[in-house]
């Protein structure tokens, strides 16, 4: 049996760190690989041939040699996951839907897939495989019991193209003991944390070490949900690295009560945990109590962050605005806290009510849910929550202002200085060989620091801890993270200005002049709708290299207007012009997240469109 497992492309967000991946990190395409698919592959029968394709780092095959296709997805991937399921099903493939959103809302997939797998896969996926082999697969496999993680196999890391990611991922535990109102983790995994054995984790590290991987993210939603189990794990990791004379670099998500356990902090430091991500949400104690985040109220949050810094462990933070207790003044409180804390990777999101969560059910009762296409992604400029003490537009405007304030060059530099004041002897010392480190710093300087002019250079130089060289790698990482987030805000949070339209109009006119002959002959159709450019190519005669080079240059200029988007439909093309299209797409790849491409079904095997860079529209194919 031939199984193709696909991880759909994520919509870009702060978590993508796109600027860093594209311009600074060496030969990387994404941050984390799809661990769930690697685990699913390990649960398949030994006789099955399994392939994993992650659309975030490679293009999807349009006509794969597969007997069935599984497409996973989180909520933010639902739109693309739906497109892929529909496309492959229309081509005659048996398709299976899975992932966290299918686990939370399997009913959303009833018309999209032949089979839906909902819940943890360790028991239900082997059952599906056996029944599929016998030709009697059901439409829904739902885990309703408790999965013992001792039954979870070593993921098939060998099926992942790990060299394309900045980290590898492992999972020690599932579940969280806390009761945050907005969180879907306890809905899916429960409040009683379960964990793998130390032997299982050592087996996974053996597999990664054999592949040359030593940078690892524990994807547990709360690694210290059971502190005693976490301490046992950490002692095991320390001994494992000593025994094998190797040094891993670890990071994970934890709750803020880590700061109250000196033994746990020391163990994390000794085990080489260089960073932790903490859901801080709000500095306001009343807001934390209202949303049931009581673990954050037991000690001053700023003091807790600094206590973690004292052990050389960096803190990444999650924050939320739009709680019921929030007013417009709350945004100033968030700003002051984030600046004082020194947290560079401060992921601020709009309060979003995920289906099946206590928050969703409460707001539904109160009639305070909005319809929103972005209700599954709280970093977009939309939410499904009706705010209580401000207007919806006021919420969005204040959110944008907050991020713009946080991501000025001055604010980035100030947070670094605040952090380094408390972060002693950082665990993080760089994660690449020395030649690659020099290359990263070089690219940061020329593509990030110097590109920002003398002012940014001045801020950068004033953050370098010249007398504490051990802190320099962390300073470099913070500048990379800060500039990546700044780039995202500049591209996605920018108000559309009437002044943009003349720029579009001038460049559009220049494009029409260049391709005028083809327009008049009907071989090219061209239209604009505000900042959306629609172009259709129906080239029934040889266009030639010069045409495609001029087209690439003019479209590149048009797309340099930040809000401009392009939908390119290729209806007809001679084989001798394929090289021209390849050059066109290569030139436009840097704008790929704003370019949608539609191919005539007869051209899908002739024209190579990298769906990991462009949005390849599958349900809108030209006839």
Per-segment meaning from a language model:
Residues 96-101, 218-221, 571, 600:
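Glycine-rich beta-strand-to-loop/alpha-helix junction loops that act as flexible
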Residues 10-19, 105-108, 227-228, 286-291, ...:
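Flexible glycine/acidic-rich beta-alpha junction loops that bind and position SAM and/or redox cofactors
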Residues 1-215:
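Acidic, low-complexity intrinsically disordered segments
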Residues 153-316, 323-336, 364:
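Radical SAM [4Fe-4S] cluster-binding motif and immediate context
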Residues 2-5, 12, 26, 49-52, ...:
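Radical SAM enzyme core and accessory elements
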Residues 88-94, 246-248, 273, 313, ...:
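A short helix->loop->beta-strand "cap" motif at the edges of active sites that frequently abuts
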Residues 61, 66-68, 233-239, 327-343, ...:
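Short, electropositive alpha-helical surface patch
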Residues 108-127, 267-275, 333-348, 583-596, ...:
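Structural recognition of alpha->loop->beta junctions
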């Amino acid at each position: 049996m031939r199984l193709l497992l696909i991880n759909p492309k994520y919509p870009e967000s702060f978590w993508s760190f796109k600027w860093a991946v594209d311009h600074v990190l060496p030969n990387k395409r994404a941050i984390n690989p799809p661990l769930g698919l690697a685990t699913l592959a390990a649960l398949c029968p030994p006789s099955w041939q399994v392939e994993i394709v992650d659309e975030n780092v490679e293009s999807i095959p349009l006509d794969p040699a597969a007997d069935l296709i599984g497409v996973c997805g989180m909520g933010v991937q639902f739109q693309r996951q739906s497109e892929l399921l529909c496309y492959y099903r229309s081509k005659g493939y048996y398709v299976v839907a899975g992932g966290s959103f299918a686990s939370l809302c399997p009913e959303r997939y009833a018309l999209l897939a032949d089979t839906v797998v909902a819940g943890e896969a360790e028991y239900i996926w082997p059952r599906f495989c056996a029944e599929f082999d016998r030709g009697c697969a059901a439409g829904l496999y739902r885990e309703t019991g408790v999965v013992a993680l001792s039954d979870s196999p070593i993921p098939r890391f060998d099926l992942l193209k790990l060299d394309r990611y900045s980290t590898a991922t492992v999972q020690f535990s599932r579940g969280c003991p806390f009761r945050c109102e907005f969180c879907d983790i306890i809905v899916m995994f429960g409040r009683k944390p379960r964990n793998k054995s130390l032997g299982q984790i050592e087996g996974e590290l053996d597999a990664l070490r054999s592949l040359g991987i030593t940078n690892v993210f524990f994807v547990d939603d709360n690694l210290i949900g059971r502190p005693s189990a976490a301490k046992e794990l950490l002692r095991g990791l320390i001994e494992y690295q000593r025994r094998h004379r190797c040094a891993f670099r670890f990071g994970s998500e934890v709750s803020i009560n880590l700061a109250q356990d000196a033994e746990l902090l020391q163990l994390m430091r000794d085990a080489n945990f260089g960073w932790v991500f903490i859901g801080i949400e709000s500095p306001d104690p009343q807001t934390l109590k209202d949303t049931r985040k009581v673990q954050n109220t037991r000690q001053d949050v700023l003091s807790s962050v600094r206590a973690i810094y004292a052990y050389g462990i960096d803190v990444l933070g999650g924050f939320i605005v739009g709680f019921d207790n929030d007013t417009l003044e709350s945004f100033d409180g968030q700003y002051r806290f984030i600046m004082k804390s020194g947290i560079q990777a401060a992921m601020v999101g709009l309060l979003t009510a995920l289906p099946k969560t206590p928050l969703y059910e409460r707001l539904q009762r109160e009639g305070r849910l909005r319809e929103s296409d972005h209700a599954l992604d709280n970093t977009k400029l939309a939410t499904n929550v009706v705010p209580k003490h401000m207007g919806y537009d006021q919420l969005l405007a204040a959110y944008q202002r907050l991020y713009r304030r946080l991501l000025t060059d001055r604010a980035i530099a100030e947070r670094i200085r605040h952090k380094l004041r408390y972060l002693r002897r950082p665990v993080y010392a760089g994660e690449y060989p020395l030649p690659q480190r020099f290359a990263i710093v070089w690219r940061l300087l020329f593509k990030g620091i110097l590109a920002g002019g003398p002012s940014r250079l001045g801020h950068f130089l004033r953050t370098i801890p010249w007398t504490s060289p051990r802190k320099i790698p962390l300073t470099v990482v913070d500048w990379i993270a800060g500039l990546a987030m700044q780039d995202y805000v500049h591209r996605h949070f920018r108000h559309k200005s009437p002044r943009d339209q003349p720029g579009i109009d001038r460049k559009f006119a220049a494009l029409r002049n260049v391709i005028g002959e083809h327009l008049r002959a009907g071989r090219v159709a061209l239209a604009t709708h505000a900042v959306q450019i629609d172009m259709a190519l129906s080239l029934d005669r040889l266009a030639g290299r010069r045409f495609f080079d001029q087209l690439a240059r003019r479209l590149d200029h048009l797309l340099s207007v930040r809000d401009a988007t392009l939908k390119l439909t290729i209806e007809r093309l001679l084989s001798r012009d394929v090289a021209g299209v390849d050059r066109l797409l290569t030139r436009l790849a840097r704008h790929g997240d704003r370019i949608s491409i539609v191919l005539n079904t007869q051209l899908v095997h002739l024209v190579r469109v990298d769906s990991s860079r462009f949005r390849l529209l599958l349900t809108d194919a030209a006839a």
